[in-house]
């Protein structure tokens, strides 16, 4: 398996996951695929989300010959993973909200989950709460507006602090001590969240856990390939110049100059608009 790692999201949120994976596997090549034409996913019907995501991801997997797919979107992960795993012959990794570690770390036994309206309403999320946080008070907060604030920041536009404060006011008033960032967009505005909520609220996301999972799936294969071929392993099966892989981005709607700068800041060397089926 020598193709790139395909990281998928509705927008720029998956960049936070991409960054964590790249820390673990810097020599791998990557394709960052984002469906910005249909952003935000939290407002889509389940059937529309499943159909669109599966078609887009499968199309791009074939195009770039990806060796693994990371669905770096909580909303999509709650719905599309079973379908993708039926359609594809390569590993598919999804995002699980960090509810289990949040429950373990909470001293007050009062945690919150901040995600899109779709994620907080799904049985999948409520199942995680029942399984891992029965001994905690768990407050659910759904916001698509916060997704768009993160997108604005990525486009180099100022964050609307008044709007941010209005969204976060119920969280601050709840007196919880651990907040799960149940949308991959939200680590992009972690600094703003921390500034408003204060140091007493611990913010948790799943980026590092996803990176560990991807590495566990790829590293044994890379090691086995190196041992059987007699070659030297330099951190990944598809190494770039001096052990650093390249990242290509693909998107479904034209991007702004500001967002292009953000992509470059994440090490993305080139990008292109793709036509969906």
From Swiss-Prot:
SUPFAM superfamilies in alphabetical order: Aspartate/glutamate racemase
Cited PANTHER family: GLUTAMATE RACEMASE
Chain positions recorded as substrate binding sites: 9-10, 41-42, 74-75, 184-185
Annotated organism of origin: Shewanella denitrificans (strain OS217 / ATCC BAA-1090 / DSM 15013)
Functional summary from the UniProt entry: Provides the (R)-glutamate required for cell wall biosynthesis.
PROSITE patterns for this protein: ASP_GLU_RACEMASE_1, ASP_GLU_RACEMASE_2
Enzyme class: isomerase
Family membership: Belongs to the aspartate/glutamate racemases family.
Enzyme Commission identifier(s): 5.1.1.3
Pathway participation: Cell wall biogenesis; peptidoglycan biosynthesis
Entry keyword DNA-binding: no
Active-site residues, Swiss-Prot/TrEMBL: 73 (proton donor/acceptor), 183 (proton donor/acceptor)
Keyword Isomerase recorded: yes
Keywords: Cell shape, Cell wall biogenesis/degradation, Isomerase, Peptidoglycan synthesis
NCBIfam families found in the cross-reference section: glut_race
Gene Ontology molecular function: glutamate racemase activity
Protein name in UniProt: Glutamate racemase
A Gene Ontology biological process term: regulation of cell shape
Catalyzed reactions per annotation: L-glutamate = D-glutamate
Gene label: murI
Lineage: Bacteria, Pseudomonadati, Pseudomonadota, Gammaproteobacteria, Alteromonadales
